[in-house]
C-alpha cells in the first residue's frame, strides 16, 4: 500500500547521529502551526470583524463561550511560543551554517516574513487601544514610499483612516495567510530533505546516519512535551504576561497611548525603526532587519560551515544575540536619552554582524592558510 511505503520511508529516513536538541525546533514549529490553526478556527467562529463589536466579541469569547478563555489564551500565548521557537530555529541556522542550504534558507526567510505579517494582522483584531494605535503607526510607514506610498496606505486602510474596512480586510488576511504558511512549510521541508539536515560539526553526515524512527521521534516527542507543558503552565498561571495593559480598553482614536509599541516579538524590528530619526530611513531599516537574513548564503566565505570551530565568529554571534535582546528592551522604553543612543548603537552592531560575516571568513581562511 502507498501509505505503508510512506510510513516505512519516514521510519527509515536517515538522519545524522550527532544532531542536538537545537534541531528539534522544526517539529515544535509544526506543532505550534497546527495549534494556531485549530484554536484560530474556533475563535473565528465567535469573532465579529466590526469596529463596534470586535472588542465585545473577544470579551464574549473569554467570558461566555465554553473553554473560550483557553482557546483565546492558547492562541495568544501560542503565537509567543511560535516566535520563541522560530527565533531559536533561525539562531541555530546562523550558528551552524544551515543557511548554506540556500533554497531551504530562502524559503524559511519567506516563511518568517509571512508569519510576521500574520501575527501583525492578528494583533489588530481584538480592537483594543494598543491594537489600534500599533496598526496606525506601522501601516503609516507605507506613506514613506515615494510616489506610491499614500495610494498604497489608502488602499490598505480601505479609506482615509483606519476604520471598519481595515479591520475586515485584516481579519481576511489573518485567516488566509496561515494556509500560505502551511504550503510554504511543506515546500521548506521538501527542500530540506533534498539535501538532508546539517549537523553541529558542519561536516558531511553521510558517513554516520541512523533511522529517524525511533531515535529522533522520541527526541522530538520529549521536546514537544516540554513545550506543551510550558505553554499550559503559562496560560493557567500567567495568561496576560505578554499582554499590554492598554489593550484591555476598547480602541479610542481620540486618545493616544503614552507609549505605542507592538507585541514583544516585533520589538527588535520596532527598536531599529525608532533608532533612525527619519521616516523613510527607519522604514528601510525595519525591512532590512529581516531581509538581511536573505544575504547569509551569499556572503559566507569561510571554508568551515559551522561556527563550532570559529571562535571569532562565535564572539560575533553571541554579541549579535545580546544586541537582539538589548534592542528589544530599548523598544519598550520612551524615545528619550539614554535609550535613543543605546538603540542606535545596538542597531549598528545588529547590522555589523551580517557585514562582518564575509570579512571574518576571509581572515579565518588566511590564519588557517586554506
From Swiss-Prot:
Binds 2 heme b groups non-covalently. It is found in: Mitochondrion inner membrane. A ubiquinone binds at residue 193. Heme b b562 binds at residues 75, 174. It comes from the Eukaryota. One of its GO terms (biological process) is mitochondrial electron transport, ubiquinol to cytochrome c. GO terms for molecular function: metal ion binding; ubiquinol-cytochrome-c reductase activity. It is a multi-pass membrane protein. The chain crosses the membrane at residues 25-45, 69-90, 105-125, 170-190, 218-238, 280-300, 312-332, 339-358. Keywords: Electron transport, Heme, Iron, Membrane, Metal-binding, Mitochondrion, Mitochondrion inner membrane, Respiratory chain, Transmembrane, Transmembrane helix, Transport, Ubiquinone. The cytochrome bc1 complex contains 3 respiratory subunits (MT-CYB, CYC1 and UQCRFS1), 2 core proteins (UQCRC1 and UQCRC2) and probably 6 low-molecular weight proteins. Belongs to the cytochrome b family. This is Cytochrome b. It comes from Corallus hortulanus enydris (Garden tree boa).
